[in-house]
Structures are given as structure tokens and as C-alpha cells.
Amino acid sequence: MLFLNTTLDGLQMGFCFAVLALGVYISYSILDFPDLSVDGTFPLGGVVCTVVLFRLNLPPVLAVLLSFAAGALAGTVTGLLHVKLKITPLLSAIIVMTALLSVTLALTQLLTPGGYTTTIFSYRGHGMRSLFDLGLSGMAEKGATIGILFGMVLLFKLLIDLFLGTRMGYMLRAAGSNSRVVVSLGRDAGNYKILGLALANGFSAVSGAVYTQYTMSYDNTSGSGKVVLALASVIIGMSLFARLRFVRNTTAVAVGAVIYSLCLNYLVLVDTNGIYLKLLNAVLFALILVGNRQLSRLLGRLKAKRAEGGARA
């Protein structure tokens, strides 16, 4: 029973983080931009969602959309620092991530009667609604939650696929892989980079908002390690489905997020006190990187042998 509950919890967490992984897929894989500001936009989405639900009493779906807008704005700032002010990608992301630490902490003042800052805020006892208020309990609640989260991930995955299939999506991909193509068409590649970073951080904020509603609490430190989590998800998904051309990259990334979250949840069974959880997380990520490198070499050798065999024939 413990293993089943751990698996179901891992699936729920995986779907929460799948949207985050989709955003990082845009910034890292498509734009080739090391966007560390994800560690800041994830909690930004959570605190904006919490403030909207607590202070404005707006519907949970609208709170998620407003969180997307806040994350997209932060991503736009990262893009402007890089494109317009010529700051390196890594430093641009670090600047925004650092600034967001203060922004998110300042927004928590709206959650307290005295206006003081807080790092943790619980939804319970405040009559706040969430996407998962279904009046269910036990396995029925877990199943319904997984269904809602799966539908959300599927929606965002399809939206990305549709967008990347448009002319603007083609320009976005070209801006990351070969900006000269964009320039040759009379367009500014920098503007498409800004757009891509806005989308990526918007998705990160959505993930933070959904995660906050799922856990029924906001934690100002929730963004810690989310870049590692998302990158691991992208690497796992892209590696596992590299040879299956019928599987879209967005699908692979989402599945990678679920697999990685399941692995993290199973690690909790090993370290019940949670003391070494971050260490185990780091070791797992290192193993994924090494495994991905070895898998790439193996596939390269197999491809070379096939080519050699075809040439002899």
C-alpha cells in the first residue's frame, strides 16, 4: 500500500512539474539559453496564485492565468537584459532570479494581516479554493487529481505543438539554432528569443501555481532546485525517446518529468527523514547525465556499424 501511494503521489508531482519541464525545453533545447531564472519564476507563480486566491477571491483557473502573465513578464526582463543590454545569458538569468527572491518575499506581505513577510503560507483555515477541491477523499481523490493534472499537461503540450508549427514557432526555433535564417528573412532574432523566454518562464510560473494549489500551501523556497529537476526531465525524456521519431519532443519531456518525479518519490522511501534527499537528488542527476552520455556513445557506435555494414553490402 505504501508503494502504491508513493507511486500515485509521484505521478501527481510529475504532472505538476511536466509543465515546468516543457518551459525549460523551450529555453534550453530550442533557444539554447541557460535560463536559471526558472528557480525564481516557479515560486513567483505560486505566490501570485496565492495572493489572487486569498485577497481577490478569484477563480483558481484565473489565478493560474495571472501567474502565467507574471512569469512571462519576468522572462521578458531576462530576454531584454540579454538582447538589448548585451548581458550574457547566464548573468541575465542570475540577475532576474536574484531580483525575484525579493519580489516573491515582498508579495507575501499581502498574505498576512500585519503586512509582514512570511516564507510559508497554508491555504487551510482561510476558505481558499483550488483546482482540486472536488469533495473526494482517498483513492478517488488521488485518481481525480491525476486526471485533472494529466488534462492540464496535455493541454499545454498541444498548445506548444500548435505554436511551434506556426510561422512564428518556426522563427523561434530558428532563432535558437541558426539566427542567420531569421535575419535573412528580415526579422529580429532577438525579439524571438525574448518571446521564447517569456513563454518558458510563463510555463514555469504556471507549474508553480498548480503545485501551490495541489499542496494547498505556498513556500517561498519552493523554487530551489527546480532547474535541476526540469533539466533532468528533459534529458531523460529526450534520451529515452531519441530513436522513436513518432514521439514528439514535448511528449518525451513530459514523460521524463513523470519518470524523474517517481524516482524522487522512491528516494523518500530510502531516506525517510529527508536529511540526505537533496544529496540523493544530486547523485541521481549526475547518474542521468553520465547515463545519457554513455547511451549517446552506444547509439553512435550502433549507427556507425550499420552504416559500415550497408557500405560493404
Regions found by a protein language model. Name each.
Residues 1-20, 48, 55-62, 128-134, ...:
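Membrane-interfacial amphipathic/re-entrant helices at transmembrane-helix boundaries
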Residues 13, 90-91, 118, 145-149, ...:
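Loop-to-transmembrane alpha-helix initiation sites
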Residues 26, 51, 76, 80-85, ...:
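Membrane-interface helix caps of multi-pass small-molecule transporters
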Residues 58-98, 256, 260:
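Alpha-helical transmembrane segments within multi-pass membrane transporters and channels
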Residues 89, 93-96, 100-165, 195, ...:
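Transmembrane helix-bundle core of multi-pass membrane transporters
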Residues 142-219, 223:
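Helix-loop-helix "hairpin" substructures at the membrane interface of multi-pass membrane proteins
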Residues 177-184, 188-191, 263-313:
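Cytosolic-side transmembrane-helix boundaries in multi-pass membrane proteins
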Residues 204-279:
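Transmembrane alpha-helical segments in multi-pass inner-membrane proteins
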